[in-house]
Structure formats: structure tokens, C-alpha cells
Curated annotation (Swiss-Prot):
GO cellular component, one term: host cell nucleus
GO molecular function: DNA binding; DNA-directed DNA polymerase activity; nucleotide binding; RNA-DNA hybrid ribonuclease activity
Protein name from the UniProt record: DNA polymerase catalytic subunit
Assigned EC number: 2.7.7.7, 3.1.26.4
Reactions mediated catalytically: DNA(n) + a 2'-deoxyribonucleoside 5'-triphosphate = DNA(n+1) + diphosphate; Endonucleolytic cleavage to 5'-phosphomonoester
GO aspect biological process, one term: viral DNA genome replication
Lineage: Viruses, Duplodnaviria, Heunggongvirae, Peploviricota, Herviviricetes
Residues covered by region (Disordered): 1-44, 646-695, 1103-1139
Primary localization class, coarse: host cell
PROSITE patterns cross-referenced by the UniProt entry: DNA_POLYMERASE_B (PS00116)
Length: 1240
């Protein structure tokens, strides 16, 4: 039974029990009896004056096999004083902090229970059999398992001496004597029972060249090597390997070949089996460094998958009798190591893959979100997990069935009582969604413990949220480990000695990036999925919801949360609604993109688990596939100093870090701006990389070739040919690989050039690659098999059901991703298996293909008759004007062909035939060109920057931001209007084309084409609106993100920092880090100049202040001197020089302040900014000369003068009006003459 949201009444007239409306009676002396809660709704939150001494929670006895909390009678009590609703306002800041002796409590629907008590009824759903050593299996529970689905794989080491009580069969004891690695498959049965299958007998191993080992170590038999290895471990620092013996190793002699170079031949190697991954890692890094190790970094899970053909990391398995008809052994509940319903011991021969089953069992998805609040003196500061006073106040959890996508439960954990708004409850009911269960708690520890207990007892297999990896999980885990000293190793699927950890893996745009590893819980952060799949100007959850879901959340600013939280249960319910709706939106995003399907498809293909697929990058995917194939072909892969090791190895602990949401902690970063708003061209120049290989050889290679664009505006059709899967097809066509490469001419001297091998010069060095009939490329085999698999999957989609089609589409997309990773895999100098010669050859061949295509097109179809000879249908697609065909741009795998004298519709129909013709004439299969699109109009600006309209009228934009998040709305709208006019108004298009055909300098001495009048009219109207006194200032608001503390900026001359300090000086609320700061640029007035002087002094005070949070001074400092040493233009005459012209960044102002005070905008700045944005886009019309472009665009705007406000007032008093747009030069001259007389 679950209680739903509602009032405090309880059934049967029982007094309602609620949290955060009071606590207990006043503090009793130590040892006295605690009084019961009053039988009414509590309105005060008692400060227990809890004793600062006391014992930690009871340690678990040696017989207990779990480290999660199953009992607790004392804990650290931290709760906000703002919950003391009857206390005076001055006593409702800060937190209560002490220790409390009682069991943790939870309140729901007027009822009260112990958090850790497990009974027949509970406040949240549970899926568990064992808790705290007690068996809660329902009556009639059948533990039989035949078929089960695996979603996660764990590995750990067991020792025979510690497992004697587990009643293992003899064959399993042999596998762990003296120690052995155990693989645990976690999954679900078709009936919904959670299962853990422990597979014994998997051994990790590595290779060493036998001749080198025998020479260096004087080994005469494999046992001698085992003795040397054991001795090396015993001599290692620390006590970890002190008792290790030669029995921990087995060695055998095998024949293998190094995968590098064609001339390498099979030779004898020692294959050394090691019973511990830690011992293996130490040996590969430290044992006899002069001897190269092979495949020592491969973890036990990968060995288990690759050494058992057909095994998968995500899919259905069947238990069967093994060798000698030996069955799998059910584990007794007393020996369970996980929170599963059933556990089995087996060996690999007890398992068979059920390939025909492709549906998913009833896995559970938890979508969660947390709300936090600072609890110190400044409740608007950004919360930091390491501070005891900064609290998690609410957690929303939405629980879905992953197979049906049904939302089954909504939970809201609340610190303090919470009444969700009736409107929210009605909305959920009207949408057919379950009523929320509100769980209330007296302290943060109780709430967090309840949340983790729920996670343990419910055990969702998949977890999602928005930026949970960078904020929510780190904050919660840091609170539990640092503040409350709670061990987390038992809160995943493992009951103890598991992993539940988050750590940093780097930083991007000042936003930390993290990994999470939880046994039996796959975390898929939708923030990462969205940033990868969708291109948006902002990745805040609200912006994503509007763009992707066409939905919008009810917004609540972080700075409003403290006031709402302190205002009672009803207002806390508003926060709760906000928290729940965030999780609802993320759930919708999850089921729109279905990331688990694509990730699981990649995991199956690559032979790695889903967590590694998410966090370990592209290289690991190709490496495992190559490792599998190399083993089948008799090759071994050299070690690269442990770079293959996975998440299970130790990683440094990490504190919680601020997530990237500006308005509150929680919505993802998404708005990383450059500090300076500049539009630099991406010149796309090739850069040469020089890499050093292990043997001291050097290889340099250029990036992909880009044919310089013929910039301009093209109104004749432009056909774009695209190389299909360019780099994979080059590898296949030319048989490129580690194993087919040779650097020595003598190695291929017995072969025939061109027929048996390819000779190519790369970076000034000759390379040789043998053809497939001599030795087939491993990379080529992988690509061929993958692409054949993808083709077969795609062919099944049209005949599939909608559900099957989605799954198949995700599978083919996963294969495409892995195929495209192969080139990059070879080209990373410090990668898992680098071969820069292969990467350099791929790009060299790609450049040659572009050049060959250009030469062929220019020669083959230079005349229309030549085109007609190849394509007779071209006779019907002739257009007025002279004929020509030339390539105007080539970009890595695309070629732009300008076709004059031909119709666009005809080229669309004939494009594929042209592409096929070029492919047959120039390239080896499977390399082929495809006709990707045909532009009817194309503005080609620079490399990787163009705007065009394809047949059908759709506009395509690449590399050009028409709508930039750090431009104001007015400039974005005007820029878009100009582009639409250029492409969709034929008169303007024709005039622009004529403009682009002539040198830009010519137009400086002659009028612009008349057809551009409409274009100019938009600029004139924009100028009029900018100078209109009735303009809407909101249209001119710019924004920039406060990416870090103002003191951390190297460049202090930034507009948004100016506004930050102005707000600080005015004692207004300053923005938090990651907030986007709005601002406008105002005119330079006396008030602005004085403010700038004061700000300079305030910046100096803030820079010298300790701590991270600035505090406004008690009184504004007086400026040391004015920003000018002479009178301003508004002062009476007599000054000798003009005032200093302020920087644009100094003219930034808070929009609200500007509106309230009537501060005038800097119209010259905004128009210059508009011209600058237009110049970036339209400079291609003027030979990419930005200076000439701006000069010519200004022609549309008559010269005007914008006096300062006080000067303008004196002119108005004298009867003058503005000389706006449209005034003639003579009228302007006469008015200015009279004005000079007036002002003199």
C-alpha cells in the first residue's frame, strides 16, 4: 500500500503525523524518556539541542554480509531553522545541527514509520527478497530460473578460504583456489525476478615473447616463469601481494604474431594466466620493463565475452547443463552477495545465448531530480555539498516500466511537510498519471537515508535525469559520505564491497565532466544525450523541452526557493511541483530518444557493458572488436600501459560540483559562451601533426583536404556530391591495417608493385600496404562485416512492427557510429592501439580523391557536348545562358559543383548517375560518390560556412549562427529577415549575384544595383527602430553567462561583469555562477561616468576580499578620481579637452535599472553591432572584405547625429527636431548650422 499526496488526516481518526511542522517536545535531559509527538499538526520545528557527543551507528557484525544500513538508532541531525514556523523571523535562519538518538522516521499521509523497517506494507514500492539478513520472499516463491536477460556484468576476486561457508561445489572451489576472478551477470527473468549468475573459471592473461623471457630471466620451463612472477609480486611495495605464490599463475607456450607490420611472422609466446586483475595490472606495468607485454590491460569481463563465442553483454541467456552434465548451483539466501531474488553459481559452459529473443524484460527506470538550498547567512548562494548547512530539500523520483514505457509511481521526498497544489494533482490525474506519494522527513539525513534505502530496495536497473552525473549524484553522495559518513558500497546491486562512486574525468568550457559507476545500475544522463543529438543555443531543460517536446515547464527561480521553502507546506508544495515536473520532462525526453536501445546495441556489438559504452569513449569499442578478430586470426595486440582499464579500478574521490543551470542547481550547463562575442572565420586550414611511435619513428600527416571555396552568391544550380562513408571505404578499398603495413621496401621486394601492394608517399615517407589477396586487413574485415550487418538490419525495418522498427533503427545507427570510429581509432597518438601511418594514409588518399574528382569533372564535362555524350537526357535540362561546370568547394567528403546552363530539376534527376559515373571512372569499390543535394541558390562564405536553398525551398545553414544566444532579439530577427530576403526575393537575389561577380572595390566608386533597394529598406527600418524613442528595450537585451566567479576572469573588461558589479554596488541580488546575466548598452552620460569610477573602487575591494561570495560594502566607495580630468560635453564651456570615451563593456547596464531610470540606449553601438552581424554573413557578396562590406551597407543609412540627452533637450527647447533617416544632405547641413549657432 502506498499513500498518495493529500492533507494530514489519517484513517480512523488517528492523529496525523507530519514532518517539518514540529519535531518533538523540548529537549529532555540525557537518559530521560522522550515525550510523544503531540496529537495535532505540528507547527514548530524543535531544535533538539542534540548532544554533540554520541556513538556512530552500530557497526555490522562479522556474520552480516551487507554494508547498507538495515538498522540505525543514532544519527547526525541537520535541518533548516526556517521550518520553525512559529519562531521569530530572526531565529529562522541557519540550521539545527547535532546528534539524535532514535530510529530515522518517515511520514506519509498522516502515518509514521521507521525508514529502515520492512513490513507487508510500505510507503514506497519494493523489489527485494532479503533485507538485513531476513528473507521476505512471498509465499509460493519459485526460485527456478531457465532463461534470463543480462543488462550489467560485474567482476570481483574470491578466495577459497573466505568462501567455505558458501557451500560451493568442488568445481567452483577449484576455480578460486587460492584465488580466482568471478564474473557476475545481473539481469531479470521473464517473470520479473531479479537474478545474479556468478560465473567461475574466467581467467585473465597476457603474453610475452618466449625468446625474450628465456634470455632475460633464464627460464627453462613455464613453471620457472611463474616463480619469477610470484617473487616480483612479493617484493612489491605494500602488503597486498606478500602471501602470493606461483600457484596464482599458469603459463603455457603458444604461437602468435604481433599485429603490427606485414613482415611480422608467428613466433612462440608465453601466455600467462593470472588469478587477480590487480596482480595482472602490477605485473604489466612493473615486471621486467624491457620485455613487451601483450593484452595485459584486458579486463576479466572482456575476456569472458570474447573467449566464449556468441556471448553478449546485453541480451538473453539460458542456463543449461555443462560439461559432464554438471548443473548450475542455486545459492542459498544466506550466501547471497547481491540484492537479487535468485542467485546461481555456474561456469561458462552452463550458459547459452538465446539469440532469437530480442524483447526487453520489465526493467525499471528511475528518473530523479533534487532541489537544494543554501542554509548559511546567504540563502541565495549556490549550495555546496561539503557545507553541512547547504541542504538537499526535495527529491522527485518517477518510476517507469522500460518495456511498456508506463509511468508506475511518482515519489517526492521532502525535508519538511509538503502539500502539492491541487491544480498539479488534478493535472496529473487528467493525464492518466499516478498520484504522487509525498514522503516527509524531519532531517536531511533521514531523507537521504530513505532515498538510498528506496534505491536499494527497489533497485531500478536504469536511472536518468538532467545533468545528474555532474550535480545530483555528486551532491547526494558527497553529503552522505562527507557529512554523514555513510558507506555506499552496499547500495548498488552488491550488498557489500561494491562500487557506488562518481569522479571527475575532465573539464569542458569550465564545466566539469564526470563518470559514475554503480553496480547494477546504468545511469544515462539526458543532458549528455541531448547535447549530442540536438543542436540548440541553450541546453537548459526549459529550452530543450520547448525545442524538442513543444512543452514548457512552470518556472521557479532558484532565488525564490528559500522564501517559498520557509512559507509553509503549501509553498513547499510549489517547489515539489517544480521538482516533479522536471523529472516528468526528462522522462518524456528519455522515451523520445530511447538512448538505452542505441547504447545497448553498441554494447552488444563491441563486447563491452553499457556503462563503458557511455563513459569510455569511441576507442574502446573498436579495440574490443579488433581484439576478438585478432585472436581468431592468430594475432596479439601490444599493451599501451594500461589504457584499457575500466571503471572498476580505483579512481580519486570527487566533491560535488555546481551543475550548469543558471536559474537553479539542476538543469545542465548548456550555455557556455565565449567571453568576447566575436565572429571569427573557421579557416579550416590543414594542420600537420607529428607523432612519435614507440620505436622512435616519426610520421607526419595532414588533416582532411579542403578545396578552397569560390566565395560569393551563386544563383545557378550547385550539385553536392558526397562520398558515402569516406574513411571506412578507403580502408576497405586499399586494405589498410596494422597488419598489412610495411615501412621497409625489402619486406615487399618479392611482391609485384600495384598488383600485390600499394606504395604511397605520406609526409615525405614511403609506405607499403599489401593487397587483400596477400593478407586481408583486419580493419577491412571488421568494416565489411559491420556494414553487411547494418545493410541486413535496415532491410528488415520496412517489414517490422513499429516497436521492432525502433529497435532495429537503433541497432543500425549503433553500427554506423562504430564504423565511423575506426579511422579515429588509428589516428590517436596516445590511443589504445595507435597507427598514425594508417590514419595519415587515409587522409592522403582522401585528398588525392578530391583532386582527382576536380580534374575529372573539369576535363570530362568542360563542354556541353561532352556531357551530352555521357548523359543523353541532359538535352532536356538545358537552361538559358552559357554552359559551364566547375567545382567551387571541396570539404573532406563533399564536392560542390556549380552547373551553369542546366536546370536544377534536371540535375536532381541526373545527379545520382553523374556520381556513379565518377565513382566507376576513378575509385576502387566500395568507394562511391552519391548525389546528396542540389542548391538552387548558395551563399558560399568560407570553408565550412555557407547558406543555401535546396530544391523544394528548404534552407540549409552550416557554420553560420543567424540566431545567436549572445545577440539581442532585435539583431537576430533583422539578420534572419535579411537572409530570407536574399534567398526568397528573386529581384534581390539577382542584384546580389551581379554584385558578387564584380570586384568589391568597384562598388566603392559606383552605385549599388537597384535590385538591392528592398535589402536596404530592411536596414533603414532597423535603423529607424533602433533610434525610435518608443522602442521596446527588451528587444535590445543581450546576455552572457557568468561561467565562474568574477575574480577568476583574466579579462575583467566584460559587459556582464560590469553589470554584476553594478548590482553589487546597488545592494541588489547578484547573479550566481552559471546564471546568464542580461544587460543593455547605454549612452555615455554623466551618471554613467560617475558609476564607472565607483565601480573601479568596488572591483578593487572585491578582489581583495577573502572567500568565494562577494559581500556588498556598507557604503559605496568614493572614486579616487573621476574617469576624466576635464569637463564633459555637458559641462559649461571652458574645458580644454573632451572626456574619456568609455569602453563598451563599461556602458553595460542592468535592463531593469535602465527602464526604471530612463537611461538612454547607445543607438550607435546597436546599429554598429547589427552591421557587424550582417557583415559576417554577407561579406561573401563583396569578396569577403568586411571593411568594404560595412562601408557599402552604411550607404543605405543617411548620416545622422545622436546628441547626448542634455544637449538634445537644449536643442528641443530651441525648436529643433531630429534629422532622422530620409533627411536630405542640404536639410541636415542647414539644421546643423543653426544648431551650432544655438549651442555656441
Amino acid at each position: 500500500m502506498f499513500c498518495a499526496a493529500g492533507g494530514p488526516a489519517s484513517p480512523g481518526g488517528k492523529p496525523a503525523a507530519r514532518a517539518a511542522s514540529g519535531f518533538f517536545a523540548p529537549h529532555n535531559p540525557r537518559g530521560a524518556t522522550q515525550t510523544a509527538p503531540p496529537p495535532c499538526r505540528r507547527q514548530n520545528f524543535y531544535n533538539p539541542h542534540l548532544a554533540q557527543t554520541g556513538t556512530q551507528p552500530k557497526a555490522l557484525g562479522p556474520a552480516q554480509r551487507h554494508t547498507y544500513y538495515s538498522e540505525c538508532d543514532e544519527f547526525r541531525f541537520i535541518a533548516p531553522r526556517s521550518l520553525d514556523e512559529d519562531a521569530p523571523a530572526e531565529q529562522r535562519t541557519g540550521v539545527h545541527d547535532g546528534r539524535l538518538r532514535r530510529a530515522p522516521k518517515v511520514y506519509c499521509g498522516g502515518d509514521e514509520r521507521d525508514v529502515l523497517r520492512v513490513g507487508p506494507e510500505g510507503f514506497w514500492p519494493r523489489r527485494l527478497r532479503l533485507w538485513g539478513g531476513a528473507d521476505h520472499a512471498p509465499e509460493g516463491f519459485d526460485p527456478t530460473v531457465t532463461v534470463f536477460h543480462v543488462y550489467d556484468i560485474l567482476e570481483h576476486v574470491e578466495h577459497a578460504y573466505s568462501m567455505r561457508a558458501a557451500q560451493l561445489h568442488e568445481r567452483f572451489m577449484d576455480a578460486i583456489t587460492p584465488a580466482g576472478t568471478v564474473i557476475t551477470l545481473l539481469g531479470l527473468t521473464p517473470e520479473g525476478h531479479r537474478v545474479a549468475v556468478h560465473v567461475y573459471g574466467t581467467r585473465q592473461y597476457f603474453y610475452m615473447n618466449k625468446a625474450e623471457v628465456d634470455r632475460h630471466l633464464q627460464c627453462r620451463a613455464p613453471r620457472d616463469l611463474c616463480e619469477r612472477l610470484a617473487a616480483a609480486l612479493r617484493e612489491s611495495p605494500g602488503a597486498s601481494f606478500r602471501g602470493i605464490s606461483a600457484d596464482h599463475f599458469e603459463a603455457e607456450v603458444v604461437e602468435r604474431a604481433d599485429v603490427y607490420y606485414y613482415e611480422t611472422r608467428p613466433t612462440l609466446y608465453y601466455r600467462v594466466f593470472v588469478r587477480s586483475g590487480r596482480a595482472l595490472a602490477y605485473l604489466c606495468d612493473n615486471f621486467c620493463p624491457a620485455i613487451r607485454k601483450y593484452e595485459g590491460g584486458v579486463d576479466a569481463t572482456t575476456r569472458f565475452i570474447l573467449d566464449n563465442p556468441g556471448f553478449v553483454t546485453f541480451g538473453w541467456y539460458r542456463l543449461k547443463p555443462g560439461r559432464g552434465n554438471a548443473p548450475a548451483q542455486p545459492r542459498p539466501p544466506t550466501a547471497f552477495g547481491t540484492s537479487s531474488d535468485v542467485e546461481f553459481n555456474c561456469t561458462a559452459d552452463n550458459l547459452a545465448v538465446e539469440g532469437a529473443m530480442c524483447d526487453l524484460p520489465a526493467y525499471k527506470l528511475m528518473c530523479f531530480d533534487i532541489e537544494c538550498k543554501a542554509g548559511g547567512e546567504d540563502e541565495l548562494a549556490f549550495p555546496v555539498a561539503e557545507r553541512p548547512e547547504d541542504l538537499v530539500i526535495q527529491i522527485s523520483c518517477l518510476l517507469y516500466d522500460l518495456s511498456t514505457t508506463a509511468l508506475e509511481h511518482i515519489l517526492l521526498f521532502s525535508l519538511g511537510s509538503c502539500d502539492l497544489p491541487e491544480s498539479h494533482l488534478s493535472d496529473l490525474a487528467s493525464r492518466g498519471l499516478p498520484a504522487p506519494v509525498v514522503l516527509e522527513f524531519d532531517s536531511e539525513f533521514e531523507m537521504l537515508l530513505a532515498f538510498m534505502t528506496f534505491v536499494k530496495q527497489y533497485g531500478p536497473e536504469f536511472v536518468t535525469g538532467y545533468n545528474i552525473i555532474n550535480f545530483d549524484w555528486p551532491f547526494v553522495l558527497t553529503k552522505l559520505t562527507e557529512i554523514y559518513k555513510v558507506p555506499l558500497d552496499g547500495y548498488g546491486r552488491m550488498n557489500g564491497r561494491g562500487v557506488f562512486r562518481v569522479w571527475d574525468i575532465g573539464q569542458s568550457h569550465f564545466q566539469k565532466r564526470s563518470k559514475i559507476k554503480v553496480n547494477g545500475m546504468v545511469n544515462i544522463d539526458m543532458y549528455g544525450i541531448i547535447t549530442d543529438k540536438v543542436k540548440l543555443s541553450s541546453y537548459k531543460l526549459n529550452a530543450v523541452a520547448e525545442a524538442v517536446l513543444k512543452d514548457k515547464k512552470k518556472d521557479l527561480s532558484y532565488r525564490d526557493i528559500p522564501a517559498y521553502y520557509a512559507s509553509g507546506p503549501a509553498q513547499r508544495g510549489v517547489i515539489g511541483e517544480y521538482c516533479v515536473q522536471d523529472s516528468l520532462l526528462v522522462g518524456q525526453l528519455f522515451f523520445k530518444f530511447l538512448p538505452h536501445l542505441e547504447l545497448s546495441a553498441v554494447a552488444r556489438l563491441a563486447g563491452i557493458n553499457i556503462t563503458r559504452t557511455i563513459y569510455d569513449g569511441q576507442q574502446i569499442r573498436v579495440f574490443t572488436c579488433l581484439l576478438r578478430l585478432a585472436g581468431q586470426k592468430g594475432f596479439i595486440l601490444p599493451d599501451t600501459q594500461g589504457r584499457f582499464r575500466g571503471l572498476d579500478k580505483e579512481a580519486p574521490k570527487r566533491p560535488a560540483v555546481p551543475r550548469g543551470e543558471g536559474e537553479r542547481p539542476g538543469d545542465g550547463n548548456g550555455d557556455e559562451d565565449k567571453d568576447d562575442d566575436e565572429d571569427g572565420d573557421e579557416d579550416g586550414d590543414e594542420r600537420e601533426e607529428v607523432a612519435r611511435e614507440t620505436g622512435g619513428r616519426h610520421v607526419g600527416y595532414q588533416g582532411a583536404r579542403v578545396l578552397d571555396p569560390t566565395s560569393g552568391f551563386h544563383v545557378d544550380p550547385v550539385v553536392v556530391f558526397d562520398f558515402a562513408s569516406l574513411y571506412p571505404s578507403i580502408i576497405q578499398a586499399h586494405n589498410l591495417c596494422f597488419s598489412t603495413l610495411s615501412l621497409r621496401p625489402e619486406a615487399v621486394a618479392h611482391l609485384e608493385a600495384d598488383r600485390d601492394y600499394l606504395e604511397i608517399e605520406v609526409g615525405g615517407r614511403r609506405l607499403f600496404f599489401v593487397k587483400a589477396h596477400v593478407r586481408e586487413s583486419l580493419l577491412s574485415i571488421l568494416l565489411r562485416d559491420w556494414l553487411a550487418m547494418r545493410k541486413q538490419i535496415r532491410s528488415r525495418i520496412p517489414q517490422s512492427t513499429p516497436e521492432e522498427a525502433v529497435l532495429l533503427d537503433k541497432q543500425q545507427a549503433a553500427i554506423k557510429v562504430v564504423c565511423n570510429s575506426v579511422y579515429g581509432f588509428t589516428g590517436v597518438q596516445h590511443g589504445l592501439l595507435p597507427c598514425l601511418h594508417v590514419a595519415a594514409t587515409v587522409t592522403t588518399i582522401g585528398r588525392e580523391m578530391l583532386l582527382a574528382t576536380r580534374a575529372y569533372v573539369h576535363a570530362r564535362w568542360a563542354e556541353f557536348d561532352q556531357l551530352l555524350a555521357d548523359f543523353p537526357e541532359a538535352a532536356g535540362m538545358r537552361a538559358p545562358g552559357p554552359y559551364s561546370m566547375r567545382i567551387i568547394y571541396g570539404d573532406t567528403d563533399s564536392i560542390f559543383v556549380l552547373c551553369r546552363g542546366l536546370t536544377a530539376a534536371g540535375l536532381v534527376a541526373m545527379g545520382d548517375k553523374m556520381a556513379s559515373h565518377i565513382s566507376r571512372a576513378l575509385f576502387l569499390p566500395p568507394i562511391k560518390l552519391e548525389c546528396e543535394k542540389t542548391f538552387t541558390k548558395l551563399l558560399l562564405i568560407a570553408k565550412k560556412k555557407y547558406i543555401g536553398v535546396i530544391c523544394g525551398g528548404k534552407m540549409l545553414i552550416k557554420g553560420v549562427d543567424l540566431v545567436r544566444k549572445n545577440n539581442c532579439a532585435f539583431i537576430n530577427r533583422t539578420s534572419r529577415a535579411l537572409v530570407d530576403l536574399l534567398f526568397y526575393d528573386d529581384t534581390v537575389s539577382g542584384a546580389a549575384a551581379a554584385l558578387a561577380e564584380r570586384p568589391a572595390e568597384e562598388w566603392l566608386a559606383r552605385p549599388l544595383p537597384e535590385g538591392l533597394q528592398a535589402f536596404g529598406a530592411v536596414l533603414v527600418d532597423a535603423h529607424r527602430r533602433i533610434t525610435d524613442p518608443e522602442r521596446d528595450i527588451q528587444d535590445f537585451v543581450l546576455t552572457a553567462e557568468l561561467s565562474r566567479h568574477p575574480r577568476a576572469y583574466t579579462n575583467k573588461r566584460l559587459a556582464h561583469l560590469t553589470v554584476y558589479y553594478k548590482l553589487m554596488a546597488r545592494r541588489a541580488q547578484v547573479p550566481s555562477i552559471k546564471d546568464r546575466i542580461p544587460y543593455v548598452i547605454v549612452a555615455q552620460t554623466r551618471e554613467v561616468e560617475e558609476t564607472v569610477a565607483r565601480l573601479a573602487a568596488l572591483r578593487e575591494l572585491d578582489a581583495a576580499a577573502p572567500g568565494d561570495e562577494p559581500a556588498p560594502p556598507a557604503a559605496l566607495p568614493s572614486p579616487a578620481k573621476r574617469p576624466r580630468e576635464t569637463p564633459s560635453h555637458a559641462d559649461p564651456p571652458g574645458g580644454a579637452s573632451k572626456p574619456r570615451k568609455l569602453l563598451v563593456s563599461e556602458l553595460a547596464e542592468d535592463p531593469g535599472y535602465a527602464i526604471a531610470r530612463g537611461v538612454p540606449l547607445n543607438t550607435d553601438y546597436y546599429f554598429s553591432h547589427l552591421l557587424g552581424a550582417a557583415c559576417v554573413t554577407f561579406k561573401a557578396l563583396f569578396g569577403n572584405n568586411a571593411k568594404i562590406t560595412e562601408s557599402l551597407l552604411k550607404r543605405f543609412i543617411p548620416e545622422t547625429w545622436h546628441p547626448p540627452d542634455d544637449v538634445a533637450a537644449r536643442l528641443r527647447a530651441a525648436g529643433f527636431g531630429p534629422a532622422g533617416a530620409g533627411a536630405t544632405a542640404e536639410e541636415t547641413r542647414r539644421m546643423l548650422h543653426r544648431a551650432f549657432d544655438t549651442l555656441a
